[in-house]
Amino acid sequence: MSDTSLDSMRDLRAASCGPVGSPEVTTDLSENVILTSLDDLHNWARLSSLWPLLYGTACCFIEFAALIGSRFDFDRFGLVPRSSPRQADLLIVAGTVTMKMAPALVRLYEQMPEPKYVIAMGACTITGGMFSADSTTAVRGVDKLIPVDLYLPGCPPRPEAIFDAVIKLRKKVGDEAIAERGKLEQTHRYSTVEHRMTAVDPIVDGRYLRAETQQKALAAAEAVSPLNLAPAEQPETIPAKS
């Protein structure tokens, strides 16, 4: 295209734009400018720099500690562990939560600035795990205390599973919108920690010892046992002379 044609196109554009004229954008600037929305820019900055607060109370936290090493290198996801809840936007709960620790966990969550996210890591965190049957102090799920964005099951989850959870959380952060964030807030955020215990019959009640097959096994064991000896005769005691 000749220079005359370019000049005529610029004159036509300037005439159609009115007295303000057409914006003059150089070629170098047009090739180095990225057009995006405020939501995409804000979400991209947050999902690339998640600062987790590590709340480890049991063995699940050992698997998360493995991510700090060079074998997995979780720094490539932009994760920067923080020791203060006021500087964190991601709370990772790993391990059993007891009734006594529940107020401290809720206090840490409330001190985190918005927007904030929670990952429940491990079976004990999600449902109480092996303590959910007869424990009087274990919380049956951390979601009874604080809202959970992502559940990570396992006993314990492997480091690769933790990476998968972080990737899924990044996708959730990337799809958020500033205008709709207020609609996503939960009305009833916390539930009570006073769990109603259900009385059940004891598991070990001795009935298996009274079974016929068990009685035969015990009798056979007593017959061949080398410890099945006659009781030793008690030595005769001679009263002392006065």
From Swiss-Prot:
Cofactor note: Binds 1 [4Fe-4S] cluster.
GO terms for cellular component: plasma membrane-derived thylakoid membrane; respiratory chain complex I
Ligand binding ([4Fe-4S] cluster): 59-60, 124, 155
Topology of the protein relative to the lipid bilayer: Peripheral membrane protein
UniProt KW keywords: 4Fe-4S, Iron, Iron-sulfur, Membrane, Metal-binding, NAD, NADP, Plastoquinone, Quinone, Thylakoid, Translocase, Transport
UniProt key word Aminoacyl-tRNA synthetase: no
Cell compartments where the protein resides: Cellular thylakoid membrane
Name of the top EC class for this enzyme: translocase
GO BP, sorted A to Z: aerobic respiration; electron transport coupled proton transport; photosynthesis, light reaction
Superkingdom: Bacteria
SUPFAM superfamilies (UniProt xref): HydA/Nqo6-like (SSF56770)
Cofactor: [4Fe-4S] cluster
An MF annotation (GO) of this entry: 4 iron, 4 sulfur cluster binding
EC number: 7.1.1.-
Subunit structure: NDH-1 can be composed of about 15 different subunits; different subcomplexes with different compositions have been identified which probably have different functions.
Family: Belongs to the complex I 20 kDa subunit family.
Function (record text): NDH-1 shuttles electrons from an unknown electron donor, via FMN and iron-sulfur (Fe-S) centers, to quinones in the respiratory and/or the photosynthetic chain. The immediate electron acceptor for the enzyme in this species is believed to be plastoquinone. Couples the redox reaction to proton translocation, and thus conserves the redox energy in a proton gradient. Cyanobacterial NDH-1 also plays a role in inorganic carbon-concentration.
UniProt-recorded name of the protein: NAD(P)H-quinone oxidoreductase subunit K
Species lineage: Bacteria, Bacillati, Cyanobacteriota, Cyanophyceae, Synechococcales
Gene: ndhK
